[in-house]
């Protein structure tokens, strides 16, 4: 990837586009102090926000952290370049082989992506507001939680929830199954307090909602901040995701 230098200060820069709360700001400061490279750091909430910005080329990002399915799309559309592992030996030394094996499902040969984080999508709930721990995705349609439900502002994840609720594959392309999921999401809308991504953390910590959809990494954080919260994976199953670094 090219080096970007300031004519005034001759300081090298790297432009990074990443999920919110994915790198401690102190880590960025340490990197800048150790390398002399300035990090220009932007955050996104969903892959669907990130992709068109990268595709348009309006911002010259050097490094981006998309999810598995989006890595595959970026490879297919020639938006990212192959990695030279000779220049990043720590990528193989410090990351377990099992993660590369999982990533090979969407990046054959691990040519384009270094795995960074993985997790699940599940239900976060407040034990003081939910009498019985949720066990099914359908619990997000329970009318007793009206105006206390938080859904993800993400087409992919919301459809995953609705598809799994009905016993379908989260990757279904069947039109009839997708229509059933669509109808369910429309029917659920009057019960939903808000469609959120990063805001779900503060809302659940503050006791502003009873139940919602959350990534497992966020769940670990919010449970640490509010012991009244708990996280479950519904019995119908869920999506396991991997986010990784690409150039």
Each language-model region and where it sits:
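A ligand-binding cleft/hinge motif common to bilobed small-molecule-binding domains
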Residues: 70-73, 211-228
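Periplasmic-binding protein-like
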Residues: 178-187, 225-246
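Single conserved hydrophobic/aromatic residue that forms the stacking wall/gate
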Residues: 1-8, 12
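General small-molecule cofactor/ligand-binding pocket signal
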Residues: 40-42, 193-195, 230-232
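Short, polar/charged alpha-helical segment
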Residues: 17-40, 44, 74-75, 123
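Structural motif
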Residues: 44-56, 190-196
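Envelope-exposed proteins and targeting segments
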Residues: 35, 119-121, 243
């Amino acid at each position: 990837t090219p080096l970007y230098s300031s004519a005034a200060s001759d300081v090298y820069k790297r432009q990074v586009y990443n999920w919110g709360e994915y790198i401690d700001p102190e880590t960025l400061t340490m990197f800048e102090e150790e390398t002399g490279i300035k990090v220009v750091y932007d955050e996104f909430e969903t892959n669907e926000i990130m992709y068109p910005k990268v595709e348009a080329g309006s911002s010259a990002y050097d490094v981006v952290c998309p999810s598995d399915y989006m890595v595959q799309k970026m490879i297919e559309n020639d938006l990212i370049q192959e990695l030279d592992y000779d220049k990043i030996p720590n990528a193989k030394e410090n990351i377990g082989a099992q993660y590369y094996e999982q990533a090979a499902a969407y990046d054959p040969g691990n040519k384009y992506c270094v795995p960074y984080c993985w997790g699940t999508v599940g239900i976060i709930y407040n034990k003081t507001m939910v009498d019985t721990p949720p066990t099914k995705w359908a619990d997000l349609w329970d009318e007793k939680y009206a105006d206390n439900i938080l859904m993800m502002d993400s087409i992919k994840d919301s459809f995953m929830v609705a598809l799994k609720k009905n016993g379908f594959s989260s990757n279904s392309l069947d039109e009839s199954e997708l229509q059933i999921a669509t109808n369910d999401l429309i029917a659920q809308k009057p019960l939903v307090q808000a469609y959120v991504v990063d805001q779900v953390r503060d809302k659940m910590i503050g006791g502003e909602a009873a139940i919602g959809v959350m990534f497992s990494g966020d769940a670990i954080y919010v449970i640490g901040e509010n012991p009244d919260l708990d996280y479950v994976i519904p019995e119908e199953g869920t999506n396991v995701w991997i986010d990784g670094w690409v150039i």
